[in-house]
């Protein structure tokens, strides 16, 4: 019987929240275990709060974790005996994954279960019943194959996520190989965790694999994982990305690391509309609405979306999904998947799907749709594990708190709630701190990133640095990125266009002056800009500058949740301490960082 063990770091509560002591010697070990089946909710200085939810447990089950393994881990780290209801809840949630299966039998698509009582419950459910074509027995239902995604989505809402074993179409064949030497002359091979991720996803080509999400830190080579999955599939592939810069990055990597030719790779963006056996498209083009310019508002990250998926008839470029016999759809940065693309994804469940992301966190609450329509989490690795192995850089995170001038404080106090964040985030006193930090890193490659263009324009003027915003032409962006990579410029000021798929491997300092409210995904993406391993074990530095005692500081705490879950710790600096602050240069354990820089290891 489990007894009181005060030396352990966890307290598991009956509401399925879990408290983790930060100062406990076993903190890091317990944190990495919890991350496999629980989500971090709060991270004050001494005690972090996690939540065990049905979705977090279903993702764990899909990755192969059993209820007994989860309970064993909790008991191993818990101070007190586990509440009995928590044991029951965990066993129940895990048992629900796969109790309903989706299979193909004699040319018909079936929902099946070995539990007649559950089948009866489903048959009478108001959401499930309209999707049934006919009931075949006391345990089997026939559904329309076109409703495959919608049925899975409904089953997640009901609480019985289906294990999809109905298989996939093979798609138009496309034969190519991975290079052993890149076009630039560097040796190329998959890293061990990249190979593991692909094998878990592919599942030997069986119906048990072929759909799902691979979660890896920025800079750990998610693009390479996608390319390796394409090599397994050997079929026509549609790749969806956040922006045109990412499209070009995918094209460069495919040409550099595979035997695919330029004639086999097409760009489908605002500038080109080439459909080839491998086509790379942006989410923004897909969600273009003739009466709603750009439709970029459809991207994830705003206010929570309606549970109803949107009508696709007014999105002309959605026809791309049916323009070729795709065998694989790759969703780069899947946490940004816009609602209209969810809708089309629900209708193409017969095609293999691979999501790539650094975080499954969505600010719109649609993680369940990623689970049901793209697939469950198939592979995840703690960021700090890859850091210890030297595959990503060691990063020191700093939160720099600045005061607000007295007259500004009064304006802030009387501002509306909507205006308060903008007012605090654009605090003029941040500008001097940016200049000081940039001076302390005069020999480094520094990115300054923020949300508000006037603020960024002033920073660019003070630092005499180029500014890239959404209005910057793609050609100009690529020219500046190329100059930064070549070491011709060492400062770049970026708007939120710098959040995603910007390949700047030598950047080792990032200064964040403002962001999208409390967005955890944005914080993770921005840190990812400096995660490529550095020469000689050099440290990377991530600074977030916030206005103290305002909404800016509150949102910063929310933004940091995901990175805290991954083991990052923010050191607090006050503005008066910055002049005397000296950034550390070398990682404590630079063991393998140096050997992992260059060639194949710089791949995105």
Identify what each model region corresponds to.
Residues 412-451, 455-458:
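Conserved interdomain hinge at the start of the Helicase C-terminal
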Residues 207-229:
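Walker A/P-loop
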Residues 248, 264-267, 447, 454-458, ...:
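Conserved helicase ATPase core of P-loop NTP-dependent helicases/translocases
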Residues 245-272:
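Conserved helix-turn-beta segment of the N-terminal RecA-like "Helicase ATP-binding" lobe
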Residues 1-178:
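Extended alpha-helical interface modules used as scaffolds for assembling large macromolecular complexes
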Residues 327-328, 333-398, 563:
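Post-DEXD/H (motif II) to motif III coupling segment of the RecA-like Helicase ATP-binding lobe
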Residues 360, 517-542:
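Conserved SF2 helicase motif VI
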Residues 285, 291, 295-362:
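SF2 helicase catalytic motif II
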């Amino acid at each position: 019987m489990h007894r009181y063990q005060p030396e352990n770091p966890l307290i598991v509560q009956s509401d399925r929240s879990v408290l983790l002591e930060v100062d406990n010697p076993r903190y890091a070990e317990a944190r990495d275990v919890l991350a496999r089946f629980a989500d971090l909710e709060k991270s004050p200085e001494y005690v972090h709060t996690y939540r065990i939810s049905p979705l977090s447990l279903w993702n764990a089950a899909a990755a192969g974790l059993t209820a007994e393994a989860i309970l064993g881990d909790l008991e191993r780290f818990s101070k007190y005996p586990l509440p009995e209801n928590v044991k029951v809840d965990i066993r129940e949630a895990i048992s629900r994954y796969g109790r309903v299966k989706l299979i193909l039998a004699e040319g018909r698509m079936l929902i099946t279960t070995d539990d007649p009582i559950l089948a009866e419950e489903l048959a009478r459910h108001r959401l499930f019943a309209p999707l049934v074509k006919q009931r075949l027995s006391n345990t089997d239902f026939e559904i329309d194959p076109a409703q495959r995604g919608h049925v899975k989505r409904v089953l997640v809402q009901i609480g019985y996520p289906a294990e999809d074993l109905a298989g996939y179409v093979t798609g138009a064949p496309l034969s190519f190989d991975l290079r052993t030497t890149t076009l630039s002359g560097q040796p190329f091979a998959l890293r061990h965790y990249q190979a593991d991720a692909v094998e878990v996803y592919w599942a030997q080509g069986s119906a048990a694999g072929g759909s799902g999400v691979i979660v890896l830190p920025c800079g750990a080579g998610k693009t390479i994982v996608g390319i390796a999955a394409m090599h397994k599939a050997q079929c026509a592939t549609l790749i969806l990305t956040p922006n045109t810069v990412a499209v070009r990055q995918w094209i460069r990597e495919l040409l550099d690391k595979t035997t695919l030719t330029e004639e086999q790779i097409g760009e489908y963006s605002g500038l080109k509309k080439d459909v080839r056996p491998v086509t790379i498209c942006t989410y923004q083009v897909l969600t273009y609405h003739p009466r709603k310019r750009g439709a970029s508002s459809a991207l994830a990250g705003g206010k929570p979306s309606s549970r109803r998926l949107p009508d696709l008839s007014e999105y002309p470029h959605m026809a791309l999904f049916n323009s070729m016999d795709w065998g694989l759809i790759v969703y780069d940065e899947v946490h940004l998947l816009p609602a209209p693309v969810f809708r089309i994804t629900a209708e193409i469940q017969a095609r293999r799907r691979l999501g790539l992301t650094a975080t499954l966190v969505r600010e719109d609450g649609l993680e369940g749709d990623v689970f049901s329509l793209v697939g469950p989490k198939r592979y995840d690795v703690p960021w700090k594990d890859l850091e210890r192995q030297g595959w990503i850089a060691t990063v020191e995170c700093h939160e720099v708190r600045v005061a607000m001038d007295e007259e500004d404080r009064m304006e802030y106090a009387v501002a509306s709630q909507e205006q308060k964040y903008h007012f605090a985030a654009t605090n003029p006193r941040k500008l001097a701190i940016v200049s000081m930090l940039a001076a302390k890193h005069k020999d480094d490659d520094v990115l300054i990133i923020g949300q508000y263009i006037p603020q960024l324009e002033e920073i660019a003027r003070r630092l005499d640095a180029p500014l890239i915003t959404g209005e910057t032409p793609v050609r100009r962006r690529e020219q500046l990125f190329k100059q930064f990579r070549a070491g011709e410029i060492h400062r770049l000021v970026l708007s939120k266009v710098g959040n995603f798929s910007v390949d700047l491997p030598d950047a080792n300092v990032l200064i964040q002056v403002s962001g999208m409210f409390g967005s955890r995904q944005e914080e993770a993406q921005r840190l990812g800009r400096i995660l490529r391993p550095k020469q000689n074990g050099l440290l990377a530095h991530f600074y977030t500058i916030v206005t103290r005692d305002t909404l800016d500081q509150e949102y910063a705490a929310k933004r940091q949740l995901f990175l805290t879950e991954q083991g990052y710790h923010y050191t607090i600096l006050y503005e008066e301490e910055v002049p005397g602050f000296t950034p550390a240069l070398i990682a404590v354990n630079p063991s393998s960082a140096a050997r992992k820089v260059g060639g194949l290891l710089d791949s995105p």
